[in-house]
């Protein structure tokens, strides 16, 4: 049985992964649970890990995966179209996990265009051209138009986004404060967490090596928001 704080943290991680495709940072978890320090988050994560509810992903800074939810939580709010929770991050040789049959596989994935590279670091030239297409599990997608970008740089590593990852982006020009977005600044595109601060827009990295950049609201154009990622092993 989980304590109230353990349950709150587990559900926060679960919901954040569903919304953005990546686990929240320790700072975000601390803020969400209204704790005074990260040490409390460390203790809660260790307790959840020992009880088999979450696991840490190897070779990914502070990245977590929800393995299971408490019985009452899964019964009350099962993911749409699925009998059990499935993480939004798929890792493997470049293809989605195998389905039960070839027919099922054809129905459960969608070919999305890879439009180029996106900077997780210093902004690079805006993405313009389709390079190839990538099969993406339908479980990662919802309604709307989506596309894929290859990550270049290390500024989002504490959000579990590594150099060479393929991020799945839902096309759109709006985002909620705290979401990870593709932001166009002038003629350059970057992948960052967007924060709305008064009349300004902050683009935050998830790596202490990089500074938060502040812009006026008319200087940042949202091109879409992160819904998941795929990792290829070569």
Curated annotation (Swiss-Prot):
One of its GO terms (biological process) is DNA replication. Pfam families: LexA_DNA_bind, Peptidase_S24. Keywords: Autocatalytic cleavage, DNA damage, DNA repair, DNA replication, DNA-binding, Hydrolase, Repressor, SOS response, Transcription, Transcription regulation. One of its GO terms (molecular function) is DNA binding. It is an enzyme of class 3 (hydrolase). The keyword Transcription applies. Its EC number is 3.4.21.88. The record marks 120-121 as: Cleavage. Residues 26-46 bind DNA. It comes from the Bacteria. Transmembrane segments: none annotated. It catalyses: Hydrolysis of Ala-|-Gly bond in repressor LexA. InterPro entries: LexA, LexA-like, LexA/Signal_pep-like_sf, LexA_DNA-bd_dom, LexA_repressor, Peptidase_S24_LexA, Peptidase_S24_S26A/B/C, WH-like_DNA-bd_sf. Residues 73-107 are annotated as: Disordered. The active site is at 155 (for autocatalytic cleavage activity), 192 (for autocatalytic cleavage activity). Represses a number of genes involved in the response to DNA damage (SOS response), including recA and lexA. In the presence of single-stranded DNA, RecA interacts with LexA causing an autocatalytic cleavage which disrupts the DNA-binding part of LexA, leading to derepression of the SOS regulon and eventually DNA repair. HAMAP family: LexA (MF_00015). Belongs to the peptidase S24 family. Homodimer. This is LexA repressor.
């Amino acid at each position: 049985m989980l304590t109230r704080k353990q349950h709150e943290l587990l559900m926060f991680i679960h919901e954040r992964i569903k919304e953005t495709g990546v686990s929240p940072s320790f700072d975000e978890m601390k803020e969400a649970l209204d704790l005074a320090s990260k040490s409390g988050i460390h203790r809660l994560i260790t307790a959840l890990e020992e009880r088999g509810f979450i696991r840490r992903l190897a070779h990914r800074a502070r990245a977590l995966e929800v393995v299971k939810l408490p019985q009452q939580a899964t019964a009350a709010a099962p993911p749409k179209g699925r009998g059990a929770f499935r993480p939004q991050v798929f890792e493997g040789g470049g293809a989605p996990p195998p389905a039960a049959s070839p027919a099922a596989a054809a129905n459960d994935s969608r070919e999305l265009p890879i439009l180029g590279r996106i900077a997780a670091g210093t902004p690079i030239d805006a993405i313009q051209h389709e390079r190839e297409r990538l099969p993406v599990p339908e479980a990662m997608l919802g309604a709307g138009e989506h596309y894929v970008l290859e990550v270049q740089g290390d500024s989002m590593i504490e959000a579990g986004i590594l150099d060479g990852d393929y991020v799945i982006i839902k096309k759109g020009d709006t985002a909620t404060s705290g979401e990870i977005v593709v932001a166009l600044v002038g003629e350059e595109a970057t992948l960052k967490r967007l924060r709305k601060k008064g009349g300004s827009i902050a683009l935050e990295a998830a790596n202490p090596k990089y500074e938060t950049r502040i812009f006026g609201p008319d200087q940042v154009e949202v091109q879409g928001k992160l819904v998941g990622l795929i990792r290829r092993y070569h």
